C-alpha cells in the first residue's frame, strides 16, 4: 500500500500536516472549490518563482495564505507590487480579507516539489532525462537527504512507446509511517508530449508529533536551568584518581596523630599501617628462620625514624645452642 498511495496523505497526523486548515459545516463544498482555485492561480503565472506549497487557513471573515517559495523576490516583486496584485486577486476571488505571507524555502535541494519542477524544466529544455535525474539525486544527497527516488514516465527520449524509468539512491522506506518522506510531482511539456516527474525524498525518522517534540524540548530546557551546579572536588574525599592516594595518606596521618603520636602509644593501628608500608624484613639469625619465631617491627611515626630491629630473648639463647652442637 505504501508503494502506491501519496506519502503525504498516508502520513497525515503522524509526520505530515494538512495544507488546508479550516472547519465548515454547510459551506464545505464551496471552501474546497476555493482552495483548488487559489492553488491553481498560484501555479499559473508563477512557474519561475519555485513555489513549493500553499497553506490556507480560514477564520471567521478572514483568510490567511502562506506561500512557500524558493525565490521570494519574484513573488514579492518590485516594491511589493506583485504581492499587492496577488492579494487583490485573492480578495476578489474569495470576497474576504486576505493575509498574505511569503515564506522562503531554506534548502530547496531537498524539497521534493522543487526537485521535480527542476527536472521537468530540464526535460523541457531537451536535456537527457538520465542526466537530469542523476544531477538532481547528487545535489539532494549532498544537501543532507538520506535517500531519494526520481521517476520519469512518458515518451522518454522521443521514443514511440512510452515507458517509466526511475533511479534511487540511499533509503526510501515508503511503508514506515514514522519516516519523514517528502513527495512532489510535476509535468514537463515536450515536443513529444508530456512527461510526468515524481520525486520521493527521505529526510529521516520522526518519532513524535510536533506538539510532543516542542513540549519535550521545553521541559529539557527547564531542567537544564534548574539543575544545581556541582561544587569543587576536594583531594581528601578520594573521588578523583589523583586525589585518592593523597586522601588516604592524609587520613592515615591524622589517625596516627590522634591515637599514638610520638610517645609510642599508637598501638596496633600504627603497627598494621607500618607493616603494610614497610617491606618484609629478613630474620636476624638462621635459628629464628628455622623455628619460625616472629620478629617485631618498630613503630614508625612521622616525627622519628625507624629504630634498628631488636634481638629477642629466644634468639639470644638460640645462638649458644648452635655453637654447642
From Swiss-Prot:
Pfam families referenced in this protein's UniProt entry, alphabetically: KH_2, Ribosomal_S3_C
PROSITE patterns according to UniProt: KH_TYPE_2 (PS50823), RIBOSOMAL_S3 (PS00548)
Gene Ontology cellular component annotations, sorted alphabetically: cytosolic small ribosomal subunit
Ranges of compositional bias, category Low complexity: 285-316
A Gene Ontology BP annotation from the UniProt entry: translation
Keywords annotated in UniProt: Ribonucleoprotein, Ribosomal protein, RNA-binding, rRNA-binding
Domain KH type-2: 38-106
Extent of Basic residues compositional bias: 222-232
GO MF: mRNA binding; rRNA binding; structural constituent of ribosome
Disordered: annotated segments: 217-325
Family: Belongs to the universal ribosomal protein uS3 family.
Oligomer status and interactors: Part of the 30S ribosomal subunit. Forms a tight complex with proteins S10 and S14.
Function: Binds the lower part of the 30S subunit head. Binds mRNA in the 70S ribosome, positioning it for translation.
HAMAP family listed in its UniProt record: Ribosomal_uS3_B
Name of the protein this chain belongs to: Small ribosomal subunit protein uS3
Organism of derivation: Parafrankia sp. (strain EAN1pec)
